[in-house]
């Protein structure tokens, strides 16, 4: 891609969550970003103005619902409503990071299922399709009645480590049981075995014990996760792997939320390098020397073109 794309009916708009990524995606597709503005009334209400005609157009809106989650979500919902009322033919949401995905079920009594609520809001506002990346819970796709293209960053992350020639003694590690499928996909691409961190609390008020299922002694370990938030799990896992004899520990994730003590924990951990994507825009204060960021612009740009041309996107899932 990156050549000029000749279809005036294809429009890409960006809101405020990750404009840099949106500009990269538009460049990959070969068109300019659509003209729109987001302003606020004095009481904080969001006002959106679409500054060009989109009547009969197939519109793609790029917006992650990352921090500030509620602000970014409301921007998106208001934008969808504006596009619907301006007679867009289709309204396609490109959401690299789907916020509220961790609230996908009732873990305790009287809890909401917020991932479903967000899906309802997006659909009710008028979205006709969604393209997203590595949802925390893949079953959230079932909360929608519109088509969802659920991409993953495993190929991008795997290629990074493959190009670094880390040797034959690689092991891909899942930091919990829920991430085993993701770890297995990376392991298949790197032709490496997997290991699993099994966290157990032997009895109440006793610290969790990290048991490692698999052989990591003398190995170079790559921990893969979908989200790193406070970095507690991944840094404790890295420490446990080193104590079990791993020679080096790398870590990677699709969504670097990185809140609270995350940066200090990563800096102080035995992790050699943390590789993340740009699904979430990172401010300067969240950058450290041992971090590297990969762009998902080519992946999302290719998905947009294929969807627009009614071509298959299934090869992008592999």
Swiss-Prot record:
InterPro entries: PRib_PP_synth_CS, Pribosyltran_N, PRibTrfase_dom, PRTase-like, Rib-P_diPkinase, Rib-P_diPkinase_bac
Subcellular location: Cytoplasm
Record text on cofactor binding: Binds 2 Mg(2+) ions per subunit.
Positions contributing to ATP binding: 43-45, 102-103
Active site: 199
GO terms, biological process: 5-phosphoribose 1-diphosphate biosynthetic process; purine nucleotide biosynthetic process; ribonucleoside monophosphate biosynthetic process
GO cellular component terms, A-Z: cytoplasm; ribose phosphate diphosphokinase complex
Highest taxon of source: Bacteria
Record key words, sorted: ATP-binding, Cytoplasm, Kinase, Magnesium, Metal-binding, Nucleotide biosynthesis, Nucleotide-binding, Transferase
Positions with a binding annotation for D-ribose 5-phosphate: 201, 225, 229-233
Reactions performed catalytically: D-ribose 5-phosphate + ATP = 5-phospho-alpha-D-ribose 1-diphosphate + AMP + H(+)
CDD domains in the cross-refs: PRTases_typeI
Pathway noted in the entry: Metabolic intermediate biosynthesis; 5-phospho-alpha-D-ribose 1-diphosphate biosynthesis; 5-phospho-alpha-D-ribose 1-diphosphate from D-ribose 5-phosphate (route I): step 1/1
Pfam hit, one: Pribosyl_synth
Co-factor requirement: Mg(2+)
E.C. no: 2.7.6.1
Protein function: Involved in the biosynthesis of the central metabolite phospho-alpha-D-ribosyl-1-pyrophosphate (PRPP) via the transfer of pyrophosphoryl group from ATP to 1-hydroxyl of ribose-5-phosphate (Rib-5-P).
Quaternary organization: Homohexamer.
Family statement drawn from the similarity comment of this UniProt entry: Belongs to the ribose-phosphate pyrophosphokinase family. Class I subfamily.
Name of protein: Ribose-phosphate pyrophosphokinase 1
Provenance organism: Listeria innocua serovar 6a (strain ATCC BAA-680 / CLIP 11262)
Source taxonomy: Bacteria, Bacillati, Bacillota, Bacilli, Bacillales
Record gene name: prs1
